[in-house]
């Protein structure tokens, strides 16, 4: 029997500043540094922000999980610095980065935030989303083209989204670079989403041994 579960009220985090500006920035109509909220990320250098804001989808997904659980964390620039120090990103020259690299990411969030993570490979969404539970969400590798799923896609993978709910036929997810209606709490048929999916990602477990603080008076879950 297909497991059905959906987390409610998971905070959304854009990989830029103001989520309302995702469309303009994504489409190249707006300089990311013209968004007044960009300094809230901790960056002060415009060139560095422009470079990294295109590459921090995984950090944005992690922020959503931490904020949902009430786990304190640094600003995005400092989190990125820690991730680089732990080998999550490998900088190659002035304009190339390898990452987010899964294994060091899993080690980092375990040591830093006491979150357990398991890498999955070669698994379709219909299978892996059955792992979503009161103590588990999924960071899945998809094409950034999932922002406009009504359009044909030309690749799989290269971008991370946070899947926080699933039923027999659909997923619910946050896309850090998404545009409405496929941005926050986006709902998409699993079969449709699969064409963007690279078949890999990470299961983020905040259950036993994860040292998660209590969240009084806040519903953790809801029906799918």
List where the protein language model places each region.
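Conserved active-site-adjacent core of cysteine acyl-enzyme catalytic domains
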Residues: 4, 66-223
């Amino acid at each position: 029997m297909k497991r059905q579960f959906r987390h409610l009220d998971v905070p959304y985090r854009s990989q830029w500043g103001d989520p309302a500006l995702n469309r303009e920035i994504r489409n190249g109509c707006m300089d990311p540094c013209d968004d007044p909220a960009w300094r809230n990320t901790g960056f002060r250098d415009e060139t560095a922000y422009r470079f990294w804001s295109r590459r921090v989808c995984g950090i944005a997904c992690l922020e959503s999980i931490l904020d949902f659980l009430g786990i304190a964390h640094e600003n995005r620039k400092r989190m990125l610095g820690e991730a680089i120090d732990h080998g999550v990103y490998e900088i190659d020259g002035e304009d190339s980065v390898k990452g987010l690299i899964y294994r060091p990411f899993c080690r980092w969030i375990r040591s830093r935030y006491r979150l357990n993570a398991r890498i999955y490979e070669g698994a379709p969404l219909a299978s892996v989303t059955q792992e979503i539970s009161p103590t588990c969400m999924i960071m899945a590798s998809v094409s950034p083209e999932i922002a406009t799923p009504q359009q044909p896609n030309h690749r799989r993978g290269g971008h991370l989204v946070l899947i926080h709910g699933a039923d027999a036929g659909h997923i619910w997810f946050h896309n850090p670079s998404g545009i409405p209606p496929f941005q926050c709490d986006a709902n998409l048929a699993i079969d449709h989403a699969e064409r963007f999916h690279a078949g890999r990602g990470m299961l983020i477990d905040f259950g036993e041994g994860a040292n998660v603080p209590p969240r009084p008076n806040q519903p953790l879950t809801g029906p799918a």
